[in-house]
Amino acid sequence: MANATIATLIEDFHATVLPAHLKRMVDRDLSLGTPFDPAPGNLVKVVVGMRRSGKTYRLFQQIRDLLNSGIKPEQICCFNFDDDRLRPFTASTIDEVLETFFELHPSSRSQGTFLFFDEIQEVPNWDIAARRIVDTEKITMYVTGSSSRMLSTDVATEFRGRSIAYELLPFSFREYARYHHVLEDRQGMFDKEQQSLLKRACRDYLVQGGFPGVQMLDDNERAGVLQSYAQFTVARDVVERHGFSNAAFARNLARVSLASSGRDFSISKIDGMSRSAGYSPGRATISAIIDAFEDAHLLHQVYEFTHSAQKVRLGGFKVYAEDPGLLCALAPATSDGLTRALETAVYLEMRRRASSRVGSIALLKHI
């Protein structure tokens, strides 16, 4: 028999939740590819990225596109597991959601269903239930999550080659301009006034960054919120997940790393500075923490170009923040701050366009 709370959440989505969000949604440029026709054994499409980067809204955009293509609303089940009314979760919670949906819309079992599970990692053993559903039901599944249990390396492990991961970064400059309605009705070439408007918008973007939730805040509010994003990511997705013993060191290392976005980065130098300050966990642990930052989508490491896969990590490297706004929120004001924010934005745009191959973006210091 249908769970009343689950049934209410399922029905409320199409009645009130989706219409309300569509009114203020800004289209993202990340493509999730052509939707698979519902069938057993489909690959799961997983949207990964840093917390607060807009993953849920990207699911809403996909749902809107499906509806516009002629898919019936009763063939779409979108469910957010981050709801206190669902707690405590059990091993059967995901099954209850699916069975309740089919009780509400029986024909969807044979016609095929598009499942959108948001924050699915809140449910214990979610991966076991998700794999079984994918193998046995006529469905197409989209999944997203933002906790330490839903990071990029976990996706490959949980679905074992049966998923496609899509990385969603905060707003690009194009998306930022779209959000702020900068020259959205432009046609033809830019005149001088339009060029000036774009230059001003670009400068603002490099300082404010592209996290959707901070776009309408003033400078002080935005800096505080962005700092909280970074601190919470370190606490949940790095310290808690990996069990690093010194949380204060990890927080400070995150601040130093993000503030160094676009600069040469040295593990040895960090180790030396830490020892001078009275504590260092050692180079190996520092390197492991930096890797954990990258896995949590807090920053990215870029190494010097080499033809040898074995030597990728032997040369120098730089780190780039997940968003130029993080650099400006965490770094002290310096003469090269805007320049490094621009370099960070360029790297992130290259990342949006590049393949996922190791070394597809590299440093070339000497020509």
Model-predicted regions and their roles:
Residues 1-36:
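N-terminal pre-Walker A segment at the start of P-loop NTPase domains
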Residues 2-8, 154-263:
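Interdomain motor-coupling "hinge/lid" segment immediately C-terminal to the ATP-binding subdomain
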Residues 47:
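Hydrophobic anchor at the beta1->P-loop junction of P-loop NTPases
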Residues 54:
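Conserved glycine(s) of the Walker
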Residues 58:
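Hydrophobic positions on the alpha1 helix immediately C-terminal to the Walker A/P-loop
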Residues 116, 140-146, 167:
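Structural recognition of the conserved hydrophobic beta-strand(s) that form the central parallel beta-sheet
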